[in-house]
């Protein structure tokens, strides 16, 4: 833990620092130190503009190339070698059954800027989620999801 806290204050790049901050926040969360976990959550929010809930399960190989504006819900599961770009939201859909149903992101997935992934769904391994895509159902392995073609209205 001390090693991770020290790394949070070093001169390493923001993509590395945010991972250390998340690890420290989750350490406090899973040890039952709620106030310390909330302090670290606010630190992440102020430092990077990212709203990451304590309890998110992120593999250590996950990459945040531009850690700005990312929102991750409490029980989101993110496997190894996932790349999450800026302004991505991963969380629950509106409550239907009274439980928050969170997405699971499998390994080797790339999520580009502005994507929204919501609900009880799985993004299977090797999938690519394009910029500004809105995902509300399961995505098959090695699929590419993009938004529709832009339409000029005037």
Question: Model features per residue range: what roles?
Answer:
Residues 1-49, 151:
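Terminal amphipathic alpha-helical/low-complexity segments used for targeting or macromolecular assembly
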């Amino acid at each position: 833990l001390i090693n991770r806290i020290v790394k949070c204050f070093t001169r390493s790049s923001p993509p590395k620092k945010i991972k250390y901050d998340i690890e420290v926040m989750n350490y406090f969360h899973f040890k039952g130190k709620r106030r310390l976990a909330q302090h670290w959550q606010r630190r992440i929010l102020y430092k990077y503009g990212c709203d990451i809930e304590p309890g998110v399960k992120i593999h250590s190989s996950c990459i945040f190339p531009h850690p700005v504006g990312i929102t991750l819900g409490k029980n989101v599961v993110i496997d190894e070698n996932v790349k999450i770009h800026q302004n991505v939201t991963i969380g629950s859909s509106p409550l239907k059954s009274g439980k928050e149903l969170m997405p699971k992101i499998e390994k080797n997935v790339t999520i580009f800027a502005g994507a929204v992934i919501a609900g009880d769904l799985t993004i299977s391994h090797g999938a690519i989620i394009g910029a500004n895509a809105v995902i509300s159902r399961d995505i098959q392995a090695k699929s590419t999801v993009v938004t529709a073609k832009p339409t000029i209205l005037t």
